Amino acid sequence: MPRLWPWVLLGLVALEGARGKKRFRPLTYPRITNKTFIGQYVDIHNRLRSEVQPPAADMLHMTWDLALARTARAWGQKCIFQHNHFTKIKGAGHPDPNLHPVGENIWFGHARRVPFNSSNAIYSWYSDKDFYDYQDNSCSQVCRRYKQVVRASTYKVGCAVVFCRRLDRHRNTEYFVCNYGPTDTYPSRPYKTGQPCSACPEGDTCQDYLCRNSSRDKIYIKRYSRWYPPWEHRLICDDSCIVLAVLRPSLTLLAFVVVYCLQKRYPDLMLQTETV
């Protein structure tokens, strides 16, 4: 027994040290389906797209996409500040081939105990316009983030924000990821310049200097409700799965209770099998 005292003291010291060093606890971040969160970043994207200089003749209006948001969340939860290489694989970033290839922008900041605001990230991406020359289609510094925000052919966006205890060498960060579909892998200009909406696809209408189409702008929920990025390895359990998971142990427990009660009530009761 006396030999245990050193270990007990060591455990108490470790416990006291753990109490002394409190871990940072951030606010709860919005879910990818949070309407306020979605409305904020979609509206900012569309406003910035409508204000490009020189003006865009073929800039499409953006709407939210569930599958892209799930891809953004899955990558963000890995807490790796690099671009998602899976989006280059057909079907790995979005199930709809018409939205391939999938584009991406990433941002991180120090986590704070205030509600997350996506405008800081999106404006930082858009500020890359200072390094972009439209006439020469050249960048004096990195400007791919700006070109992705104002890519005219992109009409779907989905974003996610997650808390990372450690992101590379940084601690306690909020990691914001946006995925876009479709993007353009060619080093072309992000849009055609000209009178706003003068080069919209046939059948489109013009609203706030952006090309709109009710079919293209439709938001699909049920279509992608069962889709998750195949590289996420997410454990998925639908309603029937949940019922089975709850029902099976409940019935097993009930059977055990019934047998136990019968044996207590009728101690001489024997379950026999007929032999031939």
Task: Identify the role of each PLM range.
Residues P2-V276:
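Mature extracellular or exoplasmic CAP/SCP-family domains and secreted bioactive peptides
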